[in-house]
Design a protein with these regions (language model features):
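C-terminal lobe and pocket-closing loops
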Residues: 274-286, 299-403, 440-444
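Short amphipathic alpha-helical coupling segments at ligand-binding clamshell hinges
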Residues: 59, 230-237, 319-331, 421
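Glycine-centered hinge/linker elements that transmit conformational signals in sensory
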Residues: 221-250, 295
């Protein structure tokens, strides 16, 4: 089980490049210019805020009690059509000032001219967050929101079955392949990993960790590169898992998916913080038999992980972007807010994107699930500090990912190879961007 992530170029030149890129897709003229405080921001204001994360509304009430000059009107926007509703609201001129969104959608909204450039007013908060997290809200160096949460990648494995099969927690992806083969010599039915037929996020994780850059903003165009040496190195690991039948293909849409791990059919997974409470509830037979370890690496001397990021985007038309940024920074970085939101009792599933996560780690670890023989807190803290900052979402990432999902299923069925899929996706992505009037070239 895994996730997604992003990276942006932080230089002034890159910021200018993004402006050209946004203009190429219709976002440049419509996007609000860099936000600056106005006379209206000096008095009492009310901002509308959309989110669908448990526990957030309660924190909004705490803020409102302490900040009478900036009142937040919370709207629970839960539902499968939240992003469509946001787009419609922006186009109708009725959008909230602030909304939850993942990094992928923040980049897409920015490219479509649906967000406000808050670079000037948000810079004061940058130091509170990791570089990778800030990149997630600053595609091309232009800031459109504030980081909210992260989900750094690490490994969970069945320590009892690893011992039974004579294998150790893999330090590298090659180690994972070798461990899977060794385990199958003792049990032909066991799988070292799971890759759902509908979910190519494993490839995203591997590509991020390998140093690949599927998208890169460069001058006035996008460079699209799914077939770089780094990308193909990541793809090769997936191909080996498929060719050697080392991975199960349990669907994450199936409520019974947890049984593949709980019953020991699959004995390891890459995972993250928000998923831990879910396992604690759904692994009744294997409680106390699990252990955490670092995610397998491509280069242990230069550890690099991946992480999806939740963000708080400032929508086009927001009249008080400085107040929106102030509230967002308080919600996502203050000790007062994070102490509550990172408590499992809040049910938020939030893990911070701040530079120092150590105060919030211990309480998210379900003690009944793990055998206590590894330093779970250190594993999580290290994973958070190792997230690579080269990853960048492109303007059509969401559409690209949907296309990849279609081809990923064919890879899992051995109908096409990973390399064939990556080659096809690269061409599809370049063509799609150019068809939309966004200049793009293939990188390889």
């Amino acid at each position: 089980m895994s996730q997604f992530r992003t990276r942006a170029l932080a230089s002034v030149a890159a910021a200018a490049s993004l402006s050209l890129l946004l203009a190429a897709c219709g976002g440049g003229e419509d996007s609000d210019s860099a936000a600056k405080p106005t006379e209206a921001t000096k008095g009492k204001v009310t901002l509308e805020f959309w989110s669908w994360t448990d526990g957030i509304e309660a924190q909004t009430k705490v803020w409102n009690k302490e900040h009478p000059e900036t009142q937040i009107k919370f709207v629970n926007a839960a539902g499968d059509t939240a992003y469509q509703k946001l787009r419609a609201a922006v186009n109708a001129g009725t959008a909230p000032c602030l909304s939850k969104m993942d990094g992928m959608n923040l980049a897409n909204f920015a490219a479509d001219g649906l967000l406000t450039d808050i670079t000037d007013v948000a810079g004061q908060y940058k130091g509170k967050y990791t570089a990778a997290a800030w990149n997630a809200v600053s595609p091309g160096g232009t800031t459109f929101g504030i980081p909210m949460g992260s989900s750094p990648l690490f490994t969970a494995y069945r320590a009892d079955l690893f011992e039974k099969y004579g294998i150790e927690a893999p330090k590298t992806w090659d180690d994972l392949i070798a461990a899977g083969k060794k385990a199958q010599k003792k049990n032909k039915k066991v799988k070292i990993f799971n890759m759902a037929g509908e979910d190519p996020s494993t490839l995203v994780d591997l590509s991020w960790e390998s140093g690949a850059q599927w998208y890169k903003a460069e001058d006035d165009h996008w460079v699209v590169d799914f077939t770089s040496p780094e990308a193909l190195k990541a793809g090769d690991i997936v191909q080996q898992l498929v060719d050697n039948d080392l991975a199960s293909n349990a669907s994450y849409a199936d409520p019974g998916v947890f049984k593949t791990w709980d019953l020991g059919t699959t004995i390891a997974m890459t995972t993250s913080t928000w998923q831990l409470p879910i396992y604690n509830t759904n692994f009744p037979k294997s409680k106390g038999k699990w252990q955490l370890a670092d995610s397998p690496m491509f280069d242990t001397a230069k550890p690099q992980t991946s992480s999806n990021f939740d963000t708080l985007g400032v929508l086009k038309g927001c009249k008080y972007p400085d107040r929106a940024a102030e509230f967002a920074a308080w919600l996502s970085s203050s000790k007062e807010s994070l102490t509550t939101l990172t408590d499992p009792a809040s049910k938020s599933g939030l893990f911070p994107a701040v530079t120092d996560v150590s105060p919030y780690v211990d309480k998210i670890i379900p003690t009944e699930m793990f055998n206590g023989e590894s330093d779970s807190a250190k594993v999580i803290t290290d994973a958070a500090s190792w997230v690579g900052d080269q990853w960048q979402y492109g303007p059509n990432y969401a559409a690209m990912y949907s296309e990849m999902q279609k081809q990923w299923g064919k890879v899992m069925k051995k109908e096409i190879t990973v390399k064939e899929m990556l080659t096809s996706i690269e061409k599809w992505t370049v063509d799609d961007l150019n068809d939309k009037g966004i200049k793009a070239v293939a990188g390889s």
